[in-house]
């Protein structure tokens, strides 16, 4: 829709009143930095006096965001990026998400679920649609029904929207540049019974491949984007 997917994710959080962001950058960090550094002027009505180089801003259309762009290294994996952000986040609960998926996640419900659980980390669980359509078949071969890509009833995946307590940093070693958050840290949190799940029954879609981008763009252009809750 003409905006980075990161912008869409931030708009979802901002809808619920969360406007303080830390973006952990790596590859193409200069592109992300340029986008936010120039965001104010790109979204303002201005008068430019070319003889004096004076710029007068009449009105801006920016969100009330405070965005910290924190470079964590080109090749650092997810756990290492999170660990490096500890110095910025401090000793407070925080939300964590990947930069490649959008959904109509009820952030308030997610946070409430997390607080009620008493766990140190809550992930958003989502039932994906099946890869193929399913048939209902009688013993004599008669097809009784056909379901187009039904949700897989016994399969839940990590949709990448987390609420974390600062204790999660204890599960990430200092030397963690080659460690994925989803591997040792998250598995060990689960092993210790400290990982909670919030089941999201609405819309969620990752943008892993070109077709995903095309599908999401089509939804946006047709004004049928379920994640546009703002």
Where are these regions (language model features)?
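Residues at the starts of beta-strands that form the adenosine-phosphate
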Residues: 19-21, 120-121, 194
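Well-ordered alpha-helical segments embedded in enzymatic catalytic cores
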Residues: 5-9, 81-84, 185
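A conditional alpha-helix N-cap/helix-loop micro-motif detector
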Residues: 2-3, 75-78, 179
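N-terminal glycine-rich phosphate-binding loop and ensuing alpha1 helix
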Residues: 1-39, 69
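Solvent-exposed polar/charged
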Residues: 15, 87, 188-191
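Short phosphate-engaging motifs
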Residues: 28-32, 77-78, 131, 168, ...
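Conserved beta-loop-beta/alpha segment of the NTase-like Rossmann-fold superfamily
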Residues: 34-139
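Catalytic-core segments of class I nucleotidyltransferases/pyrophosphorylases
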Residues: 93-97, 102, 106-115, 127-130, ...
């Amino acid at each position: 829709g003409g905006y980075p997917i990161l912008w869409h994710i931030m708009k979802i959080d901002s809808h619920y009143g969360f406007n303080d962001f830390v973006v952990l950058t790596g590859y193409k960090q200069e592109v992300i930095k340029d986008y936010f550094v120039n965001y104010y002027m790109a979204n303002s009505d201005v008068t430019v006096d070319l003889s004096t180089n004076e710029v007068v801003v009449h009105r801006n259309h920016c969100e009330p965001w405070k965005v910290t762009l924190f470079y964590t290294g080109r090749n650092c994996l997810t756990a290492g990026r999170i660990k490096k952000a500890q110095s910025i986040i401090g000793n407070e609960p925080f939300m964590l998400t990947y930069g490649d998926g959008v959904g109509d996640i009820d952030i308030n419900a997610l946070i409430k679920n997390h607080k009620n659980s008493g766990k140190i980390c809550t992930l958003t669980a989502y039932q994906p649609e099946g890869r193929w359509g399913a048939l209902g078949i009688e013993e004599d071969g008669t097809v009784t029904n056909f379901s187009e890509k039904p949700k897989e009833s016994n399969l839940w995946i990590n949709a990448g929207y987390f609420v974390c307590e600062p204790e999660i940093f204890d599960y990430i070693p200092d030397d963690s540049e080659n460690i994925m958050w989803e591997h040792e840290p998250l598995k060990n949190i689960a092993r210790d019974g400290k990982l909670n799940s919030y089941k999201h029954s609405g819309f969620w879609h990752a943008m892993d491949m070109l077709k995903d981008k095309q599908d999401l763009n089509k939804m946006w252009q047709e004004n049928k984007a379920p994640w546009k809750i703002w």
